[in-house]
Amino acid sequence: MNSEGGKPGNVLTVNGNYTGNNGLMTFNATLGGDNSPTDKMNVKGDTQGNTRVRVDNIGGVGAQTVNGIELIEVGGNSAGNFALTTGTVEAGAYVYTLAKGKGNDEKNWYLTSKWDGVTPADTPDPINNPPVVDPEGPSVYRPEAGSYISNIAAANSLFSHRLHDRLGEPQYTDSLHSQGSASSMWMRHVGGHERSRAGDGQLNTQANRYVLQLGGDLAQWSSNAQDRWHLGVMAGYANQHSNTQSNRVGYKSDGRISGYSAGLYATWYQNDANKTGAYVDSWALYNWFDNSVSSDNRSADDYDSRGVTASVEGGYTFEAGTFSGSEGTLNTWYVQPQAQITWMGVKDSDHTRKDGTRIETEGDGNVQTRLGVKTYLNSHHQRDDGKQREFQPYIEANWINNSKVYAVKMNGQTVGREGARNLGEVRTGVEAKVNNNLSLWGNVGVQLGDKGYSDTQGMLGVKYSW
C-alpha cells in the first residue's frame, strides 16, 4: 500500500473475495478528521478471516471524527476481522481505534477518535464482536496527556510550603534573649499521594511524591527588643512518579519528574515574648527538573522545566485561654488565622515528540491563594520544669484556590486537569521542643476537590539550634 515518498492516497482494489490469514497490511494516513487523506482497501466481494493492520501517521495532527476515516470498504458480506497491531494509533491529543461503521456503512472499517464503548485489544487476536463507530460518542484522549499534566503540576508545587512546614514552631528558639542571636539548621521530609482526572474524566492519574528540604538561618535579630526577624537559605530535592490509566483505551502512561531547588526565606514575628500577634513569612525558590513521559510500546519523551516560585504568608496569633490539666499540665490555647499567596512560575520547555506531536503545557504563572485557621494547644508538664520541653498539638483547616488549570496542548488540542481549582484541606499534627536545642514536628493532611481530586501527605521535620 505504500507509495514512493509515503504519501497517502493509494487504493488497493480486490475484485473478488478477500480472506485474511493473520497477515499484515500497512496503510499511510494523515490522521485528522473524517476527510483525512489515507490509503484504502476496496473489496468488491466478501471478507473473512483475520488481518493485522498497521497505520503510519503522515503529518496528521489529530482531530475529532464523526463517522471516522474510511480505511476498508466492503461490497459483499463483511465477516472478516481487522485489528490494529498496537490496538490504537495516536495523533496529537487523540487516540484512534479501528471500528466498523453504522447504518449504511456497517460493512466498512473506519479509524475513529470517538469512543465506541469497547476497549481495543492490545494484540490483534480474533474478535467475535468488533467495535462499532459511535458518531455521538465522546472523543478519546491519549493517556500521555495525564502524565504531562501531572508533571507540570508537580514542578510548580513540590517545593511549595508554609512557615510551619519549614521551621516547625520558630518561636521555640528561645536562646535569642539569653545568649544573643541563635543559629539553626532544619530539615523536612514529605511523602504524598495524589489522585486526579483529566479529559472529561477519561484519564485517571495517581502520583506518589517525595520531597527533602533543608536549610538554616543566616541571621536572627530584633528591631525593638520585642519582635524577631529570621533570614535564611534553603535547598531541596524532590521526585514524583505518576501513572495515568485511560478508561477507554487499552494502554497506560507513566510520568516521572525529579529535580532541585535553592532559595531564601525571611520571617518576622511581632511579639516573640508572648508568642502572639502578627507574623509575616516570605520565600523565593529557583527550581529545575528533568521530566519524562513514557507509555506502552511507544517512544519515551524527555524534557526539562525551569522557573521561580515565591510566597508571602501572614497570620495573627490570639491567646484564647489557659487551663490546667488533671495530671499537672499547664495548657495555653491559641487561635491563628492565616493567609498565603504563592506564585508558581515553573515552565516546561515546549517541544515536539518523536511521533511529531507538539507539546505545550499550561498552568505556569498560577497564583495559589490559601485562607485558613490553625488552632493549637501549647502544653507543659510539671515534671518537665527546667527541661525546656514543650508539646504543641494542632489542627488547621484551609480553603485553597488556584487561578489557573494545569493542562497540556498536544498539537493545539488542550486537555486539562479537573477538580483542583478550589480545594478544602484539613491538617493535624504536633510540634515539640525536646530541649533548648532540638525541635521536632510532623503532620498529616488531606486535600479534597471536585471530580474525584484528592491529595494526602505526611511530613516529618527536625531543627537543631545553637
From Swiss-Prot:
This is Uncharacterized protein YdeU. Residues 178-466 form the Autotransporter domain. It comes from Escherichia coli (strain K12). GO terms for cellular component: outer membrane. NCBIfam families: autotrans_barl. It comes from the Bacteria. InterPro entries: AC_1 (IPR043990), Autotransporte_beta (IPR005546), Autotransporte_beta_dom_sf (IPR036709), Autotransporter_pectin_lyase_C (IPR012332), Bact_Autotransporter_VF (IPR050909), OM_autotransptr_brl_dom (IPR006315), Pectin_lyase_fold/virulence (IPR011050). CDD domains: PL2_Passenger_AT (cd01344). SUPFAM superfamilies: Autotransporter, Pectin lyase-like.
